[in-house]
Each structure stands twice: as structure tokens, then as C-alpha cells.
Amino acid sequence: MDLSNRRNPLRDLSFPPPPPPPIFHRASSTGTSFPILAVAVIGILATAFLLVSYYVFVIKCCLNWHRIDILGRFSLSRRRRNDQDPLMVYSPELRSRGLDESVIRAIPIFKFKKRYDQNDGVFTGEGEEEEEKRSQECSVCLSEFQDEEKLRIIPNCSHLFHIDCIDVWLQNNANCPLCRTRVSCDTSFPPDRVSAPSTSPENLVMLRGENEYVVIELGSSIGSDRDSPRHGRLLTGQERSNSGYLLNENTQNSISPSPKKLDRGGLPRKFRKLHKMTSMGDECIDIRRGKDEQFGSIQPIRRSISMDSSADRQLYLAVQEAIRKNREVLVVGDGGGCSSSSGNVSNSKVKRSFFSFGSSRRSRSSSKLPLYFEP
């Protein structure tokens, strides 16, 4: 056998050619990575949303449980109070300490007027500078009063406020916002007590207000309703202007306050200032006896005077002097004699005119003097 003719089996084996390099390898890797990134972002956002929702839900639940706990404690404490005092009744005064709507509407309203001062040449108010500023502004809203503006005046302390301001205040409070005086609208007078200001009769003639005031006549005439005791009537118009001369018409035992209140020029200083419908009126006490009247019909008068006013003290002494003289006349009448002056008069009267409400801000000038009548 020839060895050269033999074929090598290793040579006869043929190897396949190598595969060609991939052309789209980079494009396929980019396309597979994009969906993975999108899924990852969406998953992160969904997880964040779920976490936020969970935290919101937990916070709301905690707040609700806290409220429920507070309400439960409140109801439990309320039940305990009810068990301790089962007869306890709820009072609306505990909730609101203000005044009723009817009482608030009963507080008087008037128009604010400024008076021109010829000496100063400006519009001014009563009192000193601080008192003038306080009397011209509302202490609730701190705004100044305008001329012809409607205001409310507290009857007890005579302080002025805007209608809206004081109405809102009195709905929650029952006192004056300036002096803390309790507000009440009881304007009725007791049968044996008349509240009257201390002002001379001349001052009333100088005032030209449109307010009505009351004249109370106390007399002992029989069969006359007009002169019956404790009888009051309203005067307007001409009667109001003429009522300032009650002192001049009475010719006997007439008593008036001291003229020291009048300033130079015959006009009081406080009336040249701001005029606010103040509590001013004339005083005239006339004690007279008629021929046909019994001697026991004359009523003695006792009047309490505030000791901070010298003029009021003088008026009190003058009243006591008139009563003493009248008693002397009675003693002479019992003995058979009668003075000539006592026969010129007709009856026993006590006249007093005053405004329906007062508003002087100064305590000394606005002291109200009660008048007592003894049988």
C-alpha cells in the first residue's frame, strides 16, 4: 500500500465559515433599554403617590380620632355634671349678658348739635380740652361726632355714642363702655321722688332746644285735676318758652338758685360751649296759702342736696327759710291774725320743670337732686 496515496482524514474535514458580524446590534440594545426606563419612572411615581395618599389618610384619621376623643371627654364631663345636679336648668344669661332688643331700642336718640362760640370763633364743646374732645367722639369707634348726627345717650351716665356702635356693644354687655355704669331705661319716677337738675331759671330761657320737658305741679286744691298732687303735663311751644319766667310770676316766697352760676355777659360759660340737650331746667318752689284752705294742707318739703355745690347749699337753706316763715304764718293764723301778704295768693304749689333726660358730663354741674314730699 502506498502511503502517499492515502489521504489525511483531518485534511478532508471542512469547517463552516464564520458568521458575518451583526449589523443591527446597537439599535436592538437601545430599543430594549427604553421600555425599562419608562417602567421604572412610572413605578417610582406610583409609589410616591401611594405614599402621599397613605400619609394623608393617616393624618385625617388622627385628627378625627382626636376630635372624637375631645367630644367624648366633653360629653362625659357634662354627664357627670348632670348626674351631680340633675335639677340644673340652663340659663340664657350665662351665654349672653347683654340687653334685650326692646331695652336697647328704648334708649333715647337725639341729634347732635354744635354751638358756635363767639369768643373763640370755633366750634367747641363743654368742659376742659380733654373733656371737650371726649364729649365730641364715640368711645367705641373713636370717631368724632358730626353736626346733626343722630346719637344715643345713656340715661344713667349721659354719655354719647353712635347708634350702631352702642347697639352692638349692648347686645353683649349691659354697661356703659366708657364708665361701666349699668344701663337701664327706667325713666318712670317714683311717686314721692322727683329727680331734678340744679340749674337756675335764667338758663332755661337762654336755651332754644326743641325738646319737651315736664312740669310737675303739686297742690292741695280740691276738685281740680290739674292741680292735684303728683300731676304732670307736657309743655311745648309758647308754654315752654314762657316757663322760664315762673319765678317772676310768683310774687311770694319764691326761691331760685344763686346767680353765681352765670358768667360775665349774663350767659353761662357752659352754654356758650357745645349744647347737647343737657339736663337743665328752671327751679321754682312756691309755698302759698289761700283764705279758704285749711292750715294743715300745706306740705313741708325736704330736699337732699349734694354738698359739692355751694349754690345748691344756698338753695337748700333758702327752702328751709321759706318753710320756717310759712310755719310762722300758720301760727299767726291759729291765733286769729293773718298777714296781709298771705291773702293775695290762691293755693300751695310746688312747680318744677326739667328736661326728660340729662347729659352733663361733669359730675358737679350735672348733679341730680332728689325732691322728697312729706305728708
Swiss-Prot record:
GO cellular component, one term: membrane
Biased composition (Polar residues): 238-257
Reaction it catalyzes: S-ubiquitinyl-[E2 ubiquitin-conjugating enzyme]-L-cysteine + [acceptor protein]-L-lysine = [E2 ubiquitin-conjugating enzyme]-L-cysteine + N(6)-ubiquitinyl-[acceptor protein]-L-lysine
GO terms, biological process: protein ubiquitination
Pathway the protein takes part in: Protein modification; protein ubiquitination
CDD domains (alphabetical): RING-H2_EL5-like
Parts of the chain that traverse the membrane: 39-59
Keywords, alphabetical: Membrane, Metal-binding, Transferase, Transmembrane, Transmembrane helix, Ubl conjugation pathway, Zinc, Zinc-finger
EC number: 2.3.2.27
Positions of the UniProt region annotated as Disordered: 1-20, 223-266, 356-375
InterPro entries, sorted: ATL1/ATL16-like, Znf_RING, Znf_RING/FYVE/PHD
Major localization class: membrane
RING-type zinc-finger residues: 138-180
Gene3D superfamilies given in the database record: Zinc/RING finger domain, C3HC4 (zinc finger)
UniProt topology in membrane: Single-pass membrane protein
Domain notes: The RING-type zinc finger domain mediates binding to an E2 ubiquitin-conjugating enzyme.
Family membership noted in the UniProt record: Belongs to the RING-type zinc finger family. ATL subfamily.
Official protein name in the record: RING-H2 finger protein ATL16
